[in-house]
Amino acid sequence: RHVLELKIIEKAAVNRTAKGLKDMALALKNRAKYAAAENLIACVEADIAFHSAIAESCGNNILTALYDTLSVHVNKFFMEIYKDTTPFLASQQQHENLMQAIKDKNIQQAVAVANQIIQHK
C-alpha cells in the first residue's frame, strides 16, 4: 500500500489540477470536521476521500483504479484499528501539509510528508 501511495503522490504533485485541489480541500475540511465531532465512520470516509482525490489527480488511470480497490480494504482496516478520531486529529496538520506540497508541485516535500503520515510520526 505504501509504495502505491507514494507513487500516486509523486505523480499528483506533477499532474494535479484545480479540480483535484478543490476535491482534496473539501475532503480535508470534512476530515477535520468529523474528527473534531468524534464521528469515526465519517472521518475515515473523509480521509479516504482525501487520498482518493490525490489518486484522481495523479493522472494515471491504472494507479487510480488500484487505489480505489485498495481503499475498500483501508476502510475496513481503519475501522478495526481505530477506536476514536484521536489519530486523525493528530495527523490533520500533516495532511494539510501534504496537500500544500502537492499544490506547490513539491514532489520531495510531498513524499517526505507522506512518509511521516504512513509511519505515524
Please tell me what each predicted stretch does:
Residues 54:
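Short basic (Lys/Arg) and small-residue
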Residues 9-17, 34-38, 58-59, 79-84:
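A ubiquitous short alpha-helical element
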Residues 1-27:
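Amphipathic alpha-helical dimerization/coiled-coil segments
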Residues 25-37, 45-51, 65-121:
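C-terminal all-alpha effector/ligand-binding and dimerization domain
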Residues 1-11, 61-72:
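Conserved segment of winged-helix/HTH DNA-binding domains
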